[in-house]
């Protein structure tokens, strides 16, 4: 008879780790409401504006680069705490910075936190969760990211409304400066609230049992933590033994292990799905949606409203993905979702080619974008962090996830920099045709090379690669 699961405890530690995803989303999206005021205050030219937006991504690349090493040496929990410290320092520093250079430095610090948490949070959740619930629990991270996006949009809107309503009042006080005179400081500074919450409660989650066994050989400590999840000690010991048995053929962890045939294939596949996902258009839509809608002839107000609808669809669909990911399966979601993305992207391109000429309502463009975001959020956005946290052998998981995460952030940075150029040079229609074309190799790699991980233990998934089953 199987022991009873303490699902409430699993949810608690998953939510704590997923709070890092909320900070990821907030830190990424809040910048959109501050660009105009920051540019005016510090007299930024176009290149400096681009640097202001992109500097955090440079920090994210640095954070990803060191996250794997730090979490394998220090543990998953200390890196979560460190990322919370970085988020807090970044938000507070941005709120009180004296000049543009200081602002950039604090944004880079926050970016390092983003990079770390984007790797550590989903991995930590996957290592704590049982196979039955792992997909849904890891998807909490992606849900938290989308909620962070919405949270930033709402904070930006409310603080701007407050600043306008109280214009002319005394701004000599700190409160007046942050929320009236220079409300962009308040937008960035409000992140300190969830960051401090994350910092405090991160101390109350346990270390990953798998890390304790893999890196420290502390089986008894791992069993005691597993007993908080499994009510029966025998079941906890069985889980610990299962983890240890997978490691029996690997005496040590080293970079050279990455180049073993089965493991190297897993790493290459992870890099491919990480970077290709960024060139299928999702971040271009989330970052530059209002500009794209304005290119279609909409007013600034209508463009912002349409972007809010896109954000709401992203969040609501992520909730749906959270419910069905362990029932439908990772690969099935990708097949159907990416196929829908291709159709939606082709329809968006067609609208930009012929929509205005034929007098097609802009509501159809909104519908096509919502369909695209739905298909994307229910498939690649929901699946990528789950797969990257599941698919690697235990002894190289930290390094392999860092490599994939680095590829993801490089792709994010490139698409963020290239999208304005693509829209002006290739036209919006050509840009979305390129995004549609990039979906094809993604489906091929998923079909041909990635194993289905739904309902399988991390140890079973590891045997897929090391056993040479391709």
How should each PLM-predicted stretch be described?
Residues 1-218, 225, 248-470:
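Alpha-helical transmembrane bundle of multi-pass membrane proteins
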Residues 219, 227-232:
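TPR/TPR-like (Sel1-like) alpha-helical repeat modules
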Residues 221-222, 242:
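N-terminal juxtamembrane cytosolic/stromal segments of multi-pass membrane proteins
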Residues 233-247:
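Short, well-structured alpha-helical segments
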